[in-house]
Amino acid sequence: MHPDDQLKSALRNGFDPKLLYKEPLKTVKEPICTILEKYSKIPLEKVVSHINEVRDRAFAVFPYACIGQFSFVELSIADSPCYAEMLDRTKHGQKLLDLGCAFGQELRQLIFDGAPPTNLYGSDIQQDFLNLGYELFLDRAILPESQLIAADVLDKQSALFSRLSGKINVVYISLFLHVFQYKKQVTVVQNILDLLPAEPGALIVCRVTACRDQGVLNATRERMPYYYHDLASWKRLWEEVESQTGLRLSVETWEQPDELVKNHPLPGIYILGSAIRRL
């Protein structure tokens, strides 16, 4: 099922999007506060109201948890143990894609830290989110619109693949894969691999919502049918991809501390970090 259709189905089945809507922010954490002040040139006293206004417009488009709960201002890419490598590779001419980038907030972190904007790409299925990213960061003069591509990762005929197949050295995926069921995830991952050059060192860095007890999820899948991995299923996913593609991949995993899941209503939810390298 397409992620948009999943959401519509959940709403029909009684899911209340208000559960995903936090009260307006009163304070803003780092690093987003500094980025909006120093990079976007928004006066410090206006940063909070600016974020709240953009959040409300975005939530009206699609009531995702990442929007309603202000996840888009909880920047996480710099917390990855691979961040220094990702940043360095972009500074030396390699291309990075943030897939499922939402507002492109992680791209702005990279730019703020010195990555050349022309070496960065973002893609999201919602053009509205890409536009809202410009409203949030006020940086159309810095990040060219040509670097942001509205596309469905399942559509191999989309601009994402016609423009970028074989040209991306690093793909970053954050809280994106779980919206697909397992079999669709296999297809998504295979499509992502087509974006990478056929050479050793091509890298995929993932931040994945995971669950220590898969049984906990069974009662919720009719209402919100996401697929949260555990370590065993994550390993199985990549083994299946290797088997189907003939590629050799190195898969590293770690548990990544994350504020987002501290108050998750389901027990055993955590953030699984992973780095997949082509051998």
Swiss-Prot record:
UniProt name for this protein: Methyltransferase trt5
Enzyme Commission number(s): 2.1.3.-
Disrupted-gene phenotype: Impairs the synthesis of terretonin but accumulates 3,5-dimethylorsellinic acid (DMOA).
Alphabetical list of PANTHER family matching this protein: METHYLTRANSFERASE AUSD
Keyword line: S-adenosyl-L-methionine, Transferase
Similarity annotation: Belongs to the class I-like SAM-binding methyltransferase superfamily.
Record carries keyword rRNA processing: no
Annotated binding of S-adenosyl-L-methionine, by residue: D124, I125, D152, V153
Pathway(s): Secondary metabolite biosynthesis; terpenoid biosynthesis
Free-text function comment from the UniProt entry: Methyltransferase; part of the gene cluster that mediates the biosynthesis of terretonin, a fungal meroterpenoid that acts as a mycotoxin. The first step of the pathway is the synthesis of 3,5-dimethylorsellinic acid (DMOA) by the polyketide synthase trt4. DMOA is then prenylated into farnesyl-DMOA by the polyprenyl transferase trt2. Methylation by the methyltransferase trt5 then leads to farnesyl-DMOA methyl ester which is further subject to epoxidation by the FAD-dependent monooxygenase trt8 to yield epoxyfarnesyl-DMOA methyl ester.
Keyword ATP-binding found: no
Oligomer status and interactors: Homodimer.
Enzyme class: transferase
Matches recorded under Gene3D superfamilies: Vaccinia Virus protein VP39
MF GO annotations: transferase activity
Gene Ontology terms describing biological process: terpenoid biosynthetic process
